[in-house]
Amino acid sequence: MARTTPIARYRNIGISAHIDAGKTTTTERILFYTGVNHKIGEVHDGAATMDWMEQEQERGITITSAATTAFWSGMAKQYEPHRINIIDTPGHVDFTIEVERSMRVLDGAVMVYCAVGGVQPQSETVWRQANKYKVPRIAFVNKMDRVGANFLKVVNQIKTRLGANPVPLQLAIGAEEHFTGVVDLVKMKAINWNDADQGVTFEYEDIPADMVELANEWHQNLIESAAEASEELMEKYLGGEELTEAEIKGALRQRVLNNEIILVTCGSAFKNKGVQAMLDAVIDYLPSPVDVPAINGILDDGKDTPAERHASDDEPFSALAFKIATDPFVGNLTFFRVYSGVVNSGDTVLNSVKAARERFGRIVQMHANKREEIKEVRAGDIAAAIGLKDVTTGDTLCDPDAPIILERMEFPEPVISIAVEPKTKADQEKMGLALGRLAKEDPSFRVWTDEESNQTIIAGMGELHLDIIVDRMKREFNVEANVGKPQVAYRETIRQKVTDVEGKHAKQSGGRGQYGHVVIDMYPLEPGSNPKGYEFINDIKGGVIPGEYIPAVDKGIQEQLKAGPLAGYPVVDMGIRLHFGSYHDVDSSELAFKLAASIAFKEGFKKAKPVLLEPIMKVEVETPEENTGDVIGDLSRRRGMLKGQESEVTGVKIHAEVPLSEMFGYATQLRSLTKGRASYTMEFLKYDEAPSNVAQAVIEARGK
């Protein structure tokens, strides 16, 4: 089969936003205008197409990143058809991992902001992730019809809170119930959409007289931003020459692709205004797969030789599995992005991360939860494979004759855990299967068995994250489970360097003995300086310990790091320098050196000022003004550090840093303090030393 859409006419985009910015409604409108949906699904009646898991429809929030394909030829049918693959990303902070995962496979993103709420805390998190993956983006300021809507205020927040360089592409005509359309600052025309056909048709009109001055000012700003793309354009602009529409658009596109500016559009998805022009901006300004740098990876040659793959059908096949989902009808769905080459149904490919072959059976393209079966997928496209056996999120799928491992994704460590127990014997077996499958889908979710209590422990990024896991076990796998109290994921570390700590394991009574002897230094590492949180330096001189025993010393210490001497929590941010020791020709063994290392570790840890670290959360509360004092007082009682507050249209926004252990049940307390009028968001910020009384209580509770 030949390619139906040239790769330059592809757009792989994410739509990202804070939880209530109206992202799902925006996506629905995109599907409506691109002709996919004939009836618009509204989130508030639980019918939105993209939100296809039952919990999402009940809670009105988006959990799973669904990928959908749509076609767009422009508001005035001014383009050849472009293929837009939309990855819907969740806006709730517990699902940040989903956003991170989507960012990895996108080429561009649309950031949706609420015209009233502006740049919210989750918007900042998503922004940082988009920066990390260098994703070019445009912004859509939604909900211009709401009370308190202010387009230019949000533009200013994009600048001050995100440190970005926003350039309005449009201005809003009116606001709140008087919002009627937008001014196109490139064409210098007003756009009015037709209410009778839900905004499918529109008219260009003259700019309202009372807006001409403002429009001229922002048009000038837009032209200046375009002129900065090249010296040639700047000379033309400074010489007083007019830039053509094609020059303006080309220059703005170049600057968006270089991540130098953020073009800002506006509208009200709910009122069918603005989404159409935002789609035009996606085509005009966001990259196709050939506009972004080639993907990096390493060759599977034992030497980790760097390599890259370009977005071309002629290169060997390479793809990244970015999401595993369980579909009630077909089982496992593996969403993958093809970076190079072509794959056909029936092909055998290599999972280079696991060194295992997989056969592509059926391939489908998703429209939210409907699916269309296809025979091939080409470079730049996104699809889902049914029934791959052993693929995990982040694995590379590639041509067995040209193996490559694409850059892996990094997933954060969970900060909260709970014990789950099946209610009946029948639930026991099903629970293992269910949790295994859910862990495969979501790398930020972990499952293990506690060795002491023999309980099954599940861990994730927040209370809501784990609630939904338990809920899915019940709905999708019919597993009834009792859930324990949430537990905080503490860590242990040291604050002081200790030198010449000795560890000796010697057993030499008759027969073959055991002998290992090590001398180490232990020292604290700067938090975050080493991704593993641990380093091991071998400084043995003159063979006092033979080379073959060195890995055993490292291993002995690493085993101790899993459960620290203080309270049995993982040890982080410490380094070990092995610099002396001794061995015995006959009696030394790997086991003896492993045991000697663990003895030295325990001995040194006690002397190195051990401390307990607790997770600190970044908390933002929005509350009516009259409740500010109560909310701040309550956060202080929870050992919260107040970081500032600001006035909003809807009340006061309070910024604080609070230990996770103090935040359980906060939603209920906040509701009663403010009669349900306040809301909050919380995300993991850092680990910090727990005060001694808190540490003492935790250590005693662990029975250490």
Curated annotation (Swiss-Prot):
SUPFAM superfamilies found in the cross-reference section: EF-G C-terminal domain-like, P-loop containing nucleoside triphosphate hydrolases, Ribosomal protein S5 domain 2-like, Translation proteins
InterPro entries: EFG_II, EFG_III, EFG_III/V, EFG_IV, EFG_V, EFG_V-like, EFTu-like_2, G_TR_CS
Residue numbers carrying N6-acetyllysine: 504, 643
Gene Ontology MF annotations: GTP binding; GTPase activity; guanosine tetraphosphate binding; translation elongation factor activity
Xref: SMART domains: EFG_C, EFG_IV
GO process annotations (BP): ribosome disassembly
Compartment(s): Cytoplasm
Pfam short name (any one): EFG_III
Gene Ontology CC: cytoplasm
HAMAP family attached to this UniProt entry: EF_G_EF_2_B
Recorded family membership: Belongs to the TRAFAC class translation factor GTPase superfamily. Classic translation factor GTPase family. EF-G/EF-2 subfamily.
Record protein name field: Elongation factor G
Organism: Shigella flexneri
